[in-house]
Amino acid sequence: MTAKKTIDIVEKALEESKKLDRKFKENVDLVFNLKNIDMNLPKNRIDQEVILPHGRGKEAKVAIFASGELAIKSKKHVDLLIKPEEIEELSSNKKKFKKIADEHEFFIAEAPLMPTIGKSLGTVLGPRGKMPKPVPPNADVSGMVNNLRKTVKVRSKSTITFHTIAGSADMPKEQIAENIDTIVKRIEGILERGRLNIGSVYVKTTMGPSQRLI
């Protein structure tokens, strides 16, 4: 059950957002500040993917590297299909591929193509945290893509302050609040000391002021 406090904080953030006439659809962001933890140690860094129960508001874009039957089967479910013969072309046109990498949140790939992708395009995908997930044999590509469209990445790198998306400002406050509670619970669960490693958590719209949750 979603905490009433979370719903109240989301409501405040949305009310503040409405005071300002935005010309675009704002996201609702969740900002974490950790404490008593050494982020120079790789084991302490956050690198999680969380499926939001009510989605992101605006779905994440997904691209697939595939050939043959998988390419045919998956084309209608993804935003971009990259065939094996295109990998070499993209590796020699990094500017073009960087644009693709920035426009797509997730990449999946036919398993046999993974080594080629890593060798040819890994320098672009790796630093962005977007190396493809292999598609298992006989996988339900539609289900896999649908889950990714509702997924957010939570990455701290080496800093104690980091943020992620919890939804969009036009979603019902109860849905945003449940998304937030799902993310916070995940982060608490992987921190060595749980809630004791969290200094504060703020909720805000893209351009709006922060409202403290924790």
Task: Describe the role of every protein-language-model region.
Residues 18-72, 89, 93-94:
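Translation machinery proteins
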Residues 23-28, 190-202:
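Flexible, glycine/charged-enriched surface loops at secondary-structure junctions
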Residues 10-14:
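Charge-dense, extended regions
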Residues 74, 126, 203:
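Residue-level signature of catalytic and energy-coupling elements of molecular machines
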Residues 202-214:
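C-terminal edge-of-domain segments
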Residues 1-8, 212-214:
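Intrinsically disordered, compositionally biased charged tails
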Residues 66, 166-168, 205-207:
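Flexible glycine-/small-residue-rich
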Residues 84-177, 181, 185:
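Long, charge-patterned amphipathic alpha-helical coiled-coil/hairpin "stalk" segments used as oligomerization
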